Design a protein with these regions (language model features):
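Beta-propeller blade signature
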Residues: 2-8, 51-64, 124-144, 205-213, ...
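ATP-dependent carbohydrate kinase catalytic cores
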Residues: 140-143, 152-172, 242-248
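Aromatic (tryptophan-biased) beta-strands that constitute blades/sheets of beta-rich domains
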Residues: 9-18, 63-71, 76-89, 127, ...
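Glycine-rich, aromatic-lined ligand/substrate-binding cores of catalytic
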Residues: 162, 204, 263-306, 312, ...
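Asp-box/WD-like beta-propeller blade repeats and closely related beta-sheet repeat scaffolds
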Residues: 1-54, 60, 64-89, 94-96
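Short, glycine-/Ser/Thr-/acidic-enriched flexible segments
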Residues: 44, 113-116, 143, 153-154, ...
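Short, solvent-exposed loop/turn and secondary-structure capping segments
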Residues: 4-5, 15, 23-24, 42, ...
């Protein structure tokens, strides 16, 4: 709905989804772009794939202009990445944080979340990519069509990637002494319009070309054992095979946990310093893939309020990252070089 800023009177109200049929929640507000109110949402598993949408409404009238489902249906691009999983059983790829907007390119830049359940052996196989979960999507502002996408990882652990994307124009000169993965075809020092920042719970900084989604560079900011490689030329991510769940009741040791790394707390960017600033956590967990939260193993892990996420079929016992006594950090990272300019650590 929209309110008159001068009087507080309601100007229009539009139903986007019937929560009884396509359950979803708004955990962040919309943005206004090109005269449109652009909104994302967290879609509940029981709401089905049609609840997992981004939508655009005329900001003056409330009329729907477009909606973009984030889970492909049969016959659509990306359908094959779900294998044999029926369309109605594809759940929970949400867009529950605030998007960014580039008016020159006419692009809405949005991040997406994990599937439900998270371990992919429950969803037709661990090798399937299950688009468009844990991805950066560039949508045409006028139509909602996907111009390009980049998938940050195939997520088995509820390590969402919906967080803020920073739109920056900067020289791109990643320092090989500081940055783990670099595109070998980069021209160092070239000024480019990029998307940068920490988009997901893994705490990895990604820098992509804004117009094309081309991978430029990426580097971790916390201890993590989830991503073991990124192909610099293609941007393709390799997850750690030793911690990918293969069966129910399997326990793996994962860093970070679904608490992050990074989580809801937003980072910031200063054009004066060309540096981004992020609050982060040093967390790990013994994590269990299970559909039975009454089992002895699940009870032992979650005892004392440690945590179980039934919609993801995960249970966990969280701990500090080995080798540190500080949970919290604030890290300042150069958008040009990827160098850590400074690091503040605190117990909480």
């Amino acid at each position: 709905f929209a309110l008159d800023a001068r009087t507080g009177e309601q100007v229009w109200e539009t139903e986007i989804l019937d929560y009884k049929l396509n359950s979803a929640t708004h955990s962040s507000g919309p943005i206004i772009a090109d005269g449109l109110a652009i909104s994302g949402r967290s879609c509940r598993p029981w709401g089905g794939p049609n609840a997992c949408i981004m939508a655009a409404h005329n900001a003056s009238t409330g009329e729907e202009v477009w909606r973009r489902r984030l889970i492909p249906a049969p016959g659509e691009p990306g359908d094959e990445t779900w294998g044999d999983v029926p369309f109605e059983s594809r759940h929970h790829v949400g867009s529950w944080m605030v998007p960014s907007y580039d008016p020159e390119l006419g692009l809405i830049i949005m991040g997406t979340s994990v599937t439900s359940p998270a371990p992919k052996f429950y969803l037709g196989g661990t090798d399937n990519k299950h688009l468009y979960h844990n991805s950066t999507l560039a949508l045409e502002v006028e139509t909602g069509e996907i111009r390009w996408y980049y998938q940050h990882m195939n997520d088995h652990w509820d390590l969402d990637h919906p967080f803020e994307r920073l739109l920056v124009e900067t020289k791109v000169t990643p320092d090989p002494n500081e940055v783990t993965w670099i595109n070998p075809d980069l021209t160092p020092g070239e000024t480019r319009k990029v998307i940068t920042g920490i988009p997901g719970k893994t705490g990895i900084v990604y820098t992509l070309d804004r117009a094309t989604g081309e991978f430029l560079w990426a580097t971790p900011t916390i201890e993590q054992n989830v991503v073991i490689d990124i192909d610099g030329a293609t941007g393709e991510v390799t997850e750690n095979p030793e911690i990918i769940f293969r069966e129910a009741e399997q326990i793996v040791f994962v860093c970070p946990t679904w608490l992050g790394g990074k989580d809801w707390e937003a980072g910031a960017y200063s054009p004066l310093t060309n540096v981004m600033y992020y609050p982060l956590r040093n967390t790990c967990a013994n994590m269990l893939a299970t559909g039975n939260f009454e089992s002895d193993t699940a009870r032992a892990l979650t005892e004392g309020g440690q945590g179980g996420l039934e919609i993801y079929q995960l249970a966990a016992r969280h701990q500090l990252t080995p080798g540190t006594s500080n949970l919290g950090t604030v890290r300042a990272v150069s958008a040009e070089t990827g160098k850590t300019e400074w690091l503040f650590e605190t117990r909480a």
